[in-house]
Amino acid sequence: GVLVVHEWWGQNEYARRRARMLAELGYTALAVDMYGDGKVVDNPTDAGKLAAEVSMNMPMAKTRFEAGMQYLLNHETVDANEIAAFGYCFGGGVVLNMARIGENLKGVASFHGGLDTDHPAKPWKIKARIISFSGDADPMIGADKVAAFRKEMEGAGANYRVVIYPGAKHAFSNPEADELGKKFNLPIAYNAEADKDSWEQAKVFLREVFAAK
């Protein structure tokens, strides 16, 4: 089973489409609602507020993520020890934090998700294999944060990999990023090459983590 955690806009059609793409590959996938009550917003001000409420409240984030995980586990096709999580933007930061605190996940894939955290991983706490996809033109991440993330993962003894796409900006996997960037003057943009490559690598990643015993 695979959990999909949405961007800061909420559990919208994009997040559900990503879950459907995973289902088409044969996985049981669930688009998690980290905001509650199906909240979906259409502007950065509201999105930032909702994202901050979750990001700054780890107990709440953990509870909501685990509720989604339990719902997925209740499905007859899902093995309790065979769960992975994909996260996009805000959701990328969420799934990385869930890995940091030791959730029972086989793998975590973060797509243009934040790498910094207020909850750094303790040595040998992380159970999940981790892969992070970022663009080197993403001002929300930056080389310093990538370096700090690598150091954190090394110190935690994590099995991780960081993939950096030259020229790719924040939200590179979302085809609507160009329009949203222009509308709200945000430093985001779709990058078809990075989108395709990260998805192909993520598919291989899932096959590998679910094959590992």
Give residue spans per PLM region:
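Serine-hydrolase catalytic machinery in alpha/beta-hydrolase-like enzymes
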Residues: 1-77, 175-189
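Short alpha-helix in the alpha/beta-hydrolase fold that links the catalytic acid
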Residues: 18, 142-153
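Short beta-to-alpha linker loops that shape the active-site pocket of alpha/beta-hydrolase fold enzymes
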Residues: 34-38, 114, 168
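Primarily recognizes the serine-hydrolase "nucleophile elbow" in alpha/beta-hydrolase
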Residues: 65-127
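Short, proline-enriched alpha-helix->beta-strand connector loops that line the catalytic pocket
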Residues: 125-130, 156-159
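Short beta-strand/loop motif that positions the catalytic acidic residue
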Residues: 132-134
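Acidic catalytic loop of the alpha/beta-hydrolase fold
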Residues: 137-141, 170-171
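C-terminal catalytic histidine-bearing segment of alpha/beta-hydrolase fold enzymes
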Residues: 154-213
